[in-house]
């Protein structure tokens, strides 16, 4: 390929202009790694010793805490004879590689291991000969030498740090990574990963970022040793009776998942030490699989990320984040993952803040205002749905065939919809005799405790009385507290105050927290920050028992005397979670009280456990949440927060209206464990609308409510003058869809990886459906006769299963003439738009219906958005089944002022949907079973292998390199409109090889990985500069292996071509 050779020559020529060349000598070695090294000298963090033993103790069929791994080690020079020591806290990560923009980085890699590996870097520029990743990319000869480094071989990888990374709005130095990429998930699980720090030019002084005293790199990962290349070696070496090991046994597999930070678990990570008042930079990243939903909490500290104050950092596989803090409060503090499953499994560490007598700034808390709250924890019987009916369907909760029956059926071994719980409630004084009654504005709080609010400069005093039967506490977020006021206990003694963290039954304790400036909103934040408080004795059990409440921390002078925000009409607090009543402190009480045959209850039974997982908002399900009422044109603030585990990946969708969050216009907010958000909304359409979780299991499980917008303050009119109307003729058409029409790319990939693996999703075999399915898709037609389908142009080929790309400008209307050419009712509805009615009428088979979408200002980009932003449109007759049957497409809304015509660069746009299509939920499942398997009569729709085989990990409905048409030229300006929908497993960290992209988020930021979840729509802007065929994939382990990968091609520009 001539243009690739030319590209390489251009890079060599341009290297003369680079300011500095740096050399790193890295060897790939094999060693035994101890996940709890040094734990003999110090007590591990574990609520339950049995829990830590499960992961760390070896035995006849258990490996324990030591594993053979492959590691990146740094050497002094090219002789590879002397290693360079690294900080203890780096754990098994490779050495820190640092570069400033303009640097040429030469990484000399030698493989001392027993199998082939590579070195692949994120965030830097490289040619195909320096990519270090093996996949079918049309390269040959010398460009393939980097793809696989065999034992004993050495290779020089040449990387260049250049714009746009870091972006203009990024920190001076940002987090990137490098890892081996023969089979990336297996290589990484084996240990080959390390940090790469990219810095703006001139920001490093003696290899340290200026104005930073301490810096640390942390990887949060559930390291899956079952995927390691060395699993067999580890079984033979560390199991005392290896012949007894069943590698498919679920408990054995779980025992090999190490919930770790830099390869250390249960608090054994060494060396995180700093002085009070040190300016500390944390370079953080996640890695792993669908279970890797991380919510990192730095206890006792205030963090700044992208100019926002926060105390929780959410990380997913290949999420790359940097945060800064000024260390405060001398003592030993915990750094923990607040995913409740991870917390139990050991994903914690300690960091020490020492008093080094460094001068501290003057206390900025003057004219201290003390806000005093009297809060008790008390028992109550909580009904998740007091109306007894699903307000969305009008059905009784226990109707046969209803989604709700599994949760609300009460009987011999079922609890039903009411549970004994512990809740926080507010009282008038410390006698705790007169409970404060909630007013109409607080009706919606439901199970939540009272709102604790404060302004910057305030002192919060909470007198807490425990009326329950277990030790409890109150642990706040978003405020400052001393060790004596910390509501979370973590031993050994001396690290926590037992008095504050274990308030005994019938006892009272008064907490005091402060709100210094660094804990309050920044200039970029909203006026008030959404926060939460909860009991922290046993975080999992306490929260699931019901002990959680909302907080808001506001700018000074922004609140009225009663705590309401000035210039805001209404404030609502929403807590989305799957309350796992199996983890409740009161489970046994509930079994005794509500089941009719408690002695027959098997608490380990999966069906029993599922019946106790209550998908709720503020403790209500299926539209039973009261009090979400507002007026047209009012200024509304929503405070959202969540808690839970990896199942708690929420896309909270507000139908009928949009909101602003940090300058971005959206209608769906993504929540994760312990994440909180503040959303600003001005409702402009009258009616009853949905606020619901788009995660499909949560939606069907009842995490959906109604909010009502009324005309109540005179006439509120939409004054938008809609100019121009564009008409689209779109039909729902049933087709045979092939997720993988060619297996060539997939087969060549496995050949290059020297693996012979079957494919559970595409191999038809005797009972499985294979790659072809009957589906229904949106297709565009030329006119209202619906006789001639519009043929897709070359630049639209990439849309695949998606419906047509619909464009609209702010101030215009879109008229969709929709014909249902399928065999069952469907509709077409778009996110973000304004419609005359809050309901979307179904269109019956054979019918034609016209839908009008208005595009007011609030449908377009926010002040901090890209000029054009994507929304999704889909059918809403049955939101879940319609989606999985294939009905979804992109709507792109651009600002009025956005001019595309005069840009000298060629503008390209590609729309991508990352979705695990669950064909088990398709309307056409029975048709597909009858059509495609060789023996349909033998298929069992409840068989786990059959169910798994129908989950198609696709990009625009294509798998394993089958998505075609992602072609561009060097010098093009490319907009990627990326969307995600789906279920709990649909967390997608989208990674582009070869190029970084930019995105807007209160400034221009750069990365090569972006996180997507159900209801995430984002514009990514790319300026291709390096020719080649490049990998584009989801970085989640199972999704890579399941086929959520394709390639995009960058051709040389016209000048290069002609020259």
Swiss-Prot record:
Q: What is its EC number?
A: 1.16.3.4, 1.16.3.1, 1.11.1.9, 1.11.1.27
- GO CC terms: cell surface; extracellular space; plasma membrane
Q: What does the record note about the cofactor? A: Binds 6 Cu(2+) cations per monomer.
Residues annotated to bind Cu(2+) 1: 120, 991
A biological process term (GO) from this entry? response to nutrient
Tell me which UniProt keywords the record has, alphabetically: Calcium, Disulfide bond, Glycoprotein, Metal-binding, Oxidoreductase, Repeat, Secreted, Signal, Sodium
Binding site residues for O2: 120, 179, 991, 993, 1035
Residues with attached carbohydrate: 138, 226, 396, 582, 756, 920
Q: What induces it?
A: By inflammation.
Which annotated residues bind Cu(2+) 5? 650, 693, 698, 703
Q: Where does Cu(2+) 3 bind?
A: 181, 993, 1033
Could you name the domain of life of the organism this protein comes from? Answer: Eukaryota
Q: Which Gene3D superfamilies does the UniProt entry name for this protein?
A: Cupredoxins - blue copper proteins
Task: Give an example GO molecular function.
Answer: oxidoreductase activity, acting on metal ions, oxygen as acceptor
For binding Ca(2+), which residues are annotated in this chain's numbering? 128, 143, 146-147
List the cysteine pairs that form cystine.
173-199, 275-356, 528-554, 631-712, 868-894
What are the binding positions for Cu(2+) 2 in this chain? 122, 179, 1035
Q: What is the documented function of this protein?
A: Multifunctional blue, copper-binding (6-7 atoms per molecule) glycoprotein. It has ferroxidase activity oxidizing Fe(2+) to Fe(3+) without releasing radical oxygen species. It is involved in iron transport across the cell membrane. Copper ions provide a large number of enzymatic activites. Oxidizes highly toxic ferrous ions to the ferric state for further incorporation onto apo-transferrins, catalyzes Cu(+) oxidation and promotes the oxidation of biogenic amines such as norepinephrin and serotonin.
Name of the protein described by the UniProt record: Ceruloplasmin
Q: Which organism is it from?
A: Rattus norvegicus
């Amino acid at each position: 390929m001539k243009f690739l050779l030319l590209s390489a020559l251009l890079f060599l020529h341009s290297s003369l202009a680079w300011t500095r060349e740096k050399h790193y000598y890295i060897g790939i070695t094999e060693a035994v790694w101890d996940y709890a090294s040094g734990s003999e000298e110090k007590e591990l963090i574990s609520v339950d010793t049995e829990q830590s033993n499960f992961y760390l103790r070896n035995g006849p069929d258990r490996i324990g805490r030591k594993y053979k791994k492959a590691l990146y080690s740094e050497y002094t020079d090219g002789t590879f004879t002397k290693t360079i020591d690294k900080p203890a806290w780096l754990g098994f990560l490779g050495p820190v590689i640092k570069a400033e923009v303009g640097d040429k980085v030469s990484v000399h890699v030698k493989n001392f291991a027993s199998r082939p590996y590579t070195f692949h870097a994120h965030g830097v520029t490289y040619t195909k000969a320096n990519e270090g990743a093996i996949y079918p990319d049309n390269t040959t000869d010398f460009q393939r030498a980097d793809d696989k480094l065999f034992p004993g071989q050495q290779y020089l990888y040449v990387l260049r740090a250049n714009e746009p990374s870091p972006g203009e709005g990024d920190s001076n130095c940002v987090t990137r990574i490098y890892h081996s990429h023969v089979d990336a998930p297996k290589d990484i699980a084996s240990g080959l990963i390390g940090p790469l720090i990219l810095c703006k030019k001139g920001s490093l002084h003696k290899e340290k970022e200026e104005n930073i005293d301490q810096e640390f790199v942390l990887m949060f990962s559930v390291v899956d040793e079952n995927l390691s290349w060395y699993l067999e070696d580890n079984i033979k070496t560390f199991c005392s009776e290896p012949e007894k090991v069943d590698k498919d046994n679920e408990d054995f597999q779980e025992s090999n998942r190490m919930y770790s930070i830099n390869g250390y678990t249960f608090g054994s990570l060494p060396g995180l030490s700093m002085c009070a008042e040190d300016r500390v930079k944390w370079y953080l990243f996640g890695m792993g699989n669908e279970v890797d939903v991380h919510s990192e909490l730095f206890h006792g500290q205030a963090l700044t990320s992208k100019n926002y104050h926060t105390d929780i950092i959410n990380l997913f596989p290949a999420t790359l984040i940097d945060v800064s803090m000024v260390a405060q409060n001398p003592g030993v503090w915990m750094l923990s993952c607040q995913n409740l499953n991870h917390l139990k499994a050991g994903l914690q560490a300690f960091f020490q803040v020492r008093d080094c007598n460094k001068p501290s700034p003057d206390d900025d808390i003057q004219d201290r205002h003390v806000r005093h709250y009297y809060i008790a924890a008390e028992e109550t019987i909580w009904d998740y749905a007091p109306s007894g009916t699903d307000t969305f369907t009008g059905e009784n909760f226990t109707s046969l065939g209803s989604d709700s029956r599994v949760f609300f059926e009460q009987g011999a071994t079922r609890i039903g919809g009411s549970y004994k719980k512990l809740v926080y409630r507010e009282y008038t004084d410390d006698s705790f005799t007169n409970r404060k009654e909630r007013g109409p504005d607080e009706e919606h709080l439901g199970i939540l405790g009272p709102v604790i609010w404060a302004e910057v400069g305030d002192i919060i005093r909470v007198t807490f009385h425990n009326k329950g039967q277990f030790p409890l506490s109150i642990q706040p977020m978003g405020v400052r507290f001393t060790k004596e006021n910390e509501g979370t206990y973590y031993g050994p003694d001396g690290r926590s105050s037992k008095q504050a963290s274990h308030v005994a039954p019938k006892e009272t304790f008064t907490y005091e927290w402060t709100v210094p400036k660094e804990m309050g909103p920044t200039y970029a934040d909203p006026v008030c920050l959404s926060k939460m408080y909860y009991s922290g004795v046993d975080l999992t059990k306490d929260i699931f028992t019901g002990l959680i409440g909302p907080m808001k921390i506001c700018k000074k002078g922004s609140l009225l005397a009663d705590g309401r925000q000035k210039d805001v009409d209404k404030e609502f607090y929403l807590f989305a979670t799957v309350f796992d009543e199996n983890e409740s402190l009161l489970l046994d009480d509930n079994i005794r009280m509500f089941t009719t045959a408690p002695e027959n209850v098997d608490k380990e039974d999966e069906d029993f456990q599922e019946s106790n997982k209550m998908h709720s908002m503020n403790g209500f399900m299926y539209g039973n949440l009261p009090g979400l009422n507002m007026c047209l044109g009012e200024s509304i603030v929503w405070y959202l927060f969540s808690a839970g585990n990896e199942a708690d990946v929420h896309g909270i969708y507000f139908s009928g209206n949009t909101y602003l969050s940090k300058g971005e216009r959206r209608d769906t907010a993504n929540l994760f464990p312990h994440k909180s958000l503040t959303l600003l909304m001005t409702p402009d359409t009258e009616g009853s609308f949905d606020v619901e979780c788009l995660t499909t299991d949560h939606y069907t499980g009842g995490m959906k409510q109604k909010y009502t917008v009324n005309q109540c303050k005179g006439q509120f009119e939409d004054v938008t003058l809609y100019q121009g109307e564009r008409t689209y003729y779109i039909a729902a058409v049933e087709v045979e869809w092939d997720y993988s029409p060619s297996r060539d790319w997939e087969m060549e990939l496995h050949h290059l990886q020297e693996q012979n693996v079957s494919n559970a999703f595409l191999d038809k075999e005797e009972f499985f459906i294979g790659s072809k399915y009957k589906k229904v898709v949106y297709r565009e037609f030329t006119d209202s006769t619906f006789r001639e389908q519009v043929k897709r142009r070359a630049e639209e080929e990439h849309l695949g299963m998606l419906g047509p790309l619909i464009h609209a400008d702010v101030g215009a209307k879109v008229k969709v003439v929709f014909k249902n050419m399928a065999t069952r009712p469907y509709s077409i509805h778009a996110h973000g738009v304004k419609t005359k009615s809050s309901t979307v009428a179904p269109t019956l088979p054979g019918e034609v219906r016209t839908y009008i979408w208005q595009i007011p200002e609030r449908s377009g980009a926010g002040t901090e958005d890209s000029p054009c932003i994507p929304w999704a449109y889909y059918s809403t007759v049955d939101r879940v089944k319609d989606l999985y049957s294939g009905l979804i497409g992109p709507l792109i809304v651009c600002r009025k002022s956005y001019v595309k015509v005069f840009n000298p660069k060629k503008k390209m746009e590609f729309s991508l949907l990352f979705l695990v299509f669950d064909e088990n939920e398709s309307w056409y499942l029975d048709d597909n079973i009858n059509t495609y398997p060789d023996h349909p009569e033998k298929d069992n729709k409840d068989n786990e292998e059959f169910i798994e085989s129908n989950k198609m990990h696709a990009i625009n409905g294509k798998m394993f390199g089958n998505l075609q048409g992602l072609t561009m030229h060097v010098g093009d300006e490319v907009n990627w409109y990326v969307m995600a929908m789906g279920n709990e497993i649909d967390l997608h960290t989208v990674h582009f090889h070869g190029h970084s992209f930019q995105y807007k988020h209160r400034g221009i930021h750069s990365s090569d990985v972006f996180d997507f979840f159900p209801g995430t729509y984002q514009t990514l802007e790319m300026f291709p500069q390096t020719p080649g065929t490049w990998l584009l994939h989801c970085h989640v382990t199972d999704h890579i292996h399941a086929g959520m990968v394709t390639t995009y091609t960058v051709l040389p520009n016209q000048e290069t071509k002609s020259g």
